[in-house]
Amino acid sequence: FKVATKVTDLLDAAGIAYDVYDNIKPNPTIENVTSGVAACKAAGAEAIVAVGGGSAIDTSKAIATIMTNPEFGDVRSLEGVAPTKHPCLPIIAVSTTSGTAAEVTINYVITDAQKNRKMVCVDPKDIPVVAFVDPDMMSSMPKGLTAATGMDALTHAIEGYITAGAWELSDMFHLKAIEIISRSLRGAVDNTPEGREGMALGQYVAGMGFSNVGLGIVHSMAHPLGALYDTPHGIANAIILPTVMEYNAEATGEKYRDIAKAMGVEGTENMSQEEYRKAAVDAVKQLSKDVGIPDDLKEIVKREDIPFLAQSAY
């Protein structure tokens, strides 16, 4: 709440009335949204100030969308590309984590706890009208959360760079994001000012890219882990990313050379295709290890759940 107080103090000083809604889980649920809509109506809110990471901002997007499009009051109806007619209630996003880039993207994710699945919702009308990306607001994140959200941002950048819809403009965003994140995440985990500032920028740049082209199977497999086991999204992404990179390598042309170079690997111009592809994957594994991410799913996944997880990811 200390971080949120920085915002509420400003509202108090300006004489702006507000209510606080904080019933939000790390993997926000349908119930979090519906109770938030009720709170928003009760307050007569004209705007939402979303203070937090992806969970808070995603929940705010769903609430704000339903507020101006009441025919979508059933949260499940928002899944996919919902044909909403009106812009959502104005959202001012104040990011406190450096990973999701939810403050600049058109999508949000809500968990259907009854069905143990995550719903990806896409709506260009839900982008916040103002986004504050201030590394000082992110400086209170503990090391584990910094690492997890940072690897989430790297996953966004790498998946966005190799996705089928990638093109010149998105490539520009994603390669720069990979470079910034790779040089900044270790420092951010150690809470250095340079690391925090770099991650604030890097995750934002990645969001500007993938919001235009989409992501890949890392996310399709990570979402069921969050829905079934409440696994932190960034942890799931980080563990799965190297394996998916190996799986996708044959379809990526020379892009892994670019990824390896952006991650600081030297001599990529003299490497064979096999060498630079391995170098890119190894660089991701090393960064993940350096920031303390587990390297497998053994402590998370139950073997009997694998068929359900596979079907959910399809």
Predicted regions and their residues:
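Glycine-rich phosphate/pyrophosphate-binding beta-alpha loops
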Residues: 99, 204-237
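Carboxylate- and glycine-rich phosphate/diphosphate-binding segment that chelates Mg2+/Mn2+
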Residues: 107-213
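Gly/Pro-rich interdomain helix-loop hinge
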Residues: 228-305
